[in-house]
Amino acid sequence: MTTRYIFVTGGVVSSLGKGIAAASLAAILEARGLNVTIMKLDPYINVDPGTMSPTQHGEVFVTEDGAETDLDLGHYERFIRTKMNRRNNFTTGRIYEEVLRKERRGDYLGATIQVIPHITNAIKEKVLAGGEGHDVAIVEIGGTVGDIESLPFLESIRQLGVELGRDRTLFMHLTLVPFLGAAGEVKTKPTQHSVKELRSIGIAPDVLICRGDRAIPANERAKISLFCNVEERAVISLKDVDSIYKIPALLRSQGLDDLVVKRFGLECREADLSEWENVIYQEANPNGEVVIGMVGKYIELPDAYKSVNEALKHAGLKNRVSVTIKYIDSQTVEAKGDEVLQGLDGILVPGGFGERGVEGKILAAKFARENKLPYFGICLGMQVALIEFARNVAGMTDAHSTEFNKETPFPVVGLITEWVDEEGNVEQRHEASDLGGTMRLGAQLCHLLEGSKAAQAYKGNSCIERHRHRYEVNNKYRERLEQAGMVFSGLSSDRKLVEMIELKDHPWFVAGQFHPEFTSTPRDGHPLFEGFIAAASAHQKRDLK
């Protein structure tokens, strides 16, 4: 199969939405029957985002094969059916690590290792490998044109443009076209300078995606076309919209997919965007609203919980309600108590690391349990629910996780002592082990207890979900917790590890050690999130009565 490559760059400012634009184009091409994948090339020196602060970088998205990747890969999976893997995201740090490892082995036969050709060749190899087996591979280059960090990636795609030829490569550049209120007009000069910068390193864009808070007038598009040496039909206006799921239709209406298909000489059907039209209709026509309290520690940056936010919205679509997320700092719960938890239709405690704010999450789980309020715990959210239950129901005073209190008399949650590395080798781990890449990661089979809420949600006796954690339920206390009324509704493939818990005599109190948000999509939703929002809606209706 001959793969075509679309390289996506960004200029003027960061955070223009390259990932959303790339995913939206991929969605249209997929709707035309093409097999599409997307890659993200990140220019930072970290090997992966696994140890980066969520308040700086946003969430870490975990793929099926256990790669810790950029949150943009979450956008990719929500827009297209293709599942991402570790080949779909790599960083400058990863490239340098692999090149230096080869140098130490002597693979370069004593050559002087340089950015060109050694680093650029390694980048090109990864891009070509990531695109194998697909009709089209869209490659997003992180950062902004002009940044020194991005230069090796830009040089690599420039070389690929020459090596593969125009019939297999296309360069798409996102840029900002701001509106100046004082002048009453949009300004094209930033775009002209951004394209000039791109051309100075040997890349001539074939398509310009012009971002702004309004549609760009025809005369300004003609001006951009003239000064940037791009066909006028390839100057695409991408205005701000109230839903990212409207963007595929917006790009389709301007013929972006036709331009791509014609450029690559592909024979394919017209795009069928009916599924996206249905999503947009559901989003615009809810029959009610529910308020979900998300109790976390990274709430100053909502992108730290990007996939959870989106999964809640998807579940709202399936239940025909709009979901309002109330972000609650778990430290505020510690300071003010349950007064900040009033007026909610459900509580969700997402994943997290570190001791800060953990007691607030435990209090949130207690409030939900005692007040019969729907509760959904994810990863750490399951662990705090179990700790709360152990302390206040099972009689294990001061029960805790050894992550937060190594001297606890009841370590109901403890460190996983074995893990499997990328090569499949089993290694022993202890408290002093490296933090990066040393977690239980990726898709795992989970057996579900017959008759449980989990089994009802999944409509079966098993599920496959993605993990990212170092700590597990301590099996020593399982029997005692079960006797107190806790239900272990999900177990690992060997039935040795607890994957899900529920509470008896509660409308909906469900928690999982895994991260179901990573597999939720706007078209399909996710059974656990759907069940949670359905329970929240039912709770609200009971309160209204």
Curated annotation (Swiss-Prot):
The keyword ATP-binding applies. Its EC number is 6.3.4.2. The active site is at 379 (nucleophile), 515, 517. Pathway: Pyrimidine metabolism; CTP biosynthesis via de novo pathway; CTP from UDP: step 2/2. It catalyses: UTP + L-glutamine + ATP + H2O = CTP + L-glutamate + ADP + phosphate + 2 H(+); L-glutamine + H2O = L-glutamate + NH4(+); UTP + NH4(+) + ATP = CTP + ADP + phosphate + 2 H(+). ATP binds at residues 15-20, 72, 239-241. CTP binds at residues 14, 147-149, 187-192, 223. Catalyzes the ATP-dependent amination of UTP to CTP with either L-glutamine or ammonia as the source of nitrogen. Regulates intracellular CTP levels through interactions with the four ribonucleotide triphosphates. This is CTP synthase. It comes from Shewanella putrefaciens (strain CN-32 / ATCC BAA-453).
